[in-house]
């Protein structure tokens, strides 16, 4: 009898349309990610060459070395590009009888200066994190004063017999500062 009563109760009701509320999936929002040692204060400006990088490894010292190496490589690339622009402008504007040999000598000198000056980079930010899987992430930001590069180049030029003949420090400095302002 219990079965019969349930059957009668369920079949005698009025037929109402069943309305289901289907939940819409929540709209995914963009999530801002704050990367350590990054942002405007860590970018190259008219006074400093700057670069930021991250190294990842199961060994903290290797993670740091990776980050430092990559940041130094970025600074070297930026310096080489900037100094090439400076020397091209300087040679074509101020050197008498511009020639490829002068440009080649300036570029060779630049490579030497950059290699030596990179040891003078300064760490302006360093953050170490440990990931859930036990790896280390090291974020670094390095800087090197543009004036240090300019002075090192000027000293090298003054010591080069061929380049020294036509070299005018104040004009070179002016071109260098103009190029640094173009960031």
Feature-to-residue mapping (PLM):
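Sec-dependent bacterial lipoprotein signal peptides
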Residues: 1-15
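Domain-level marker for long, solvent-exposed, non-transmembrane regions
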Residues: 12-183
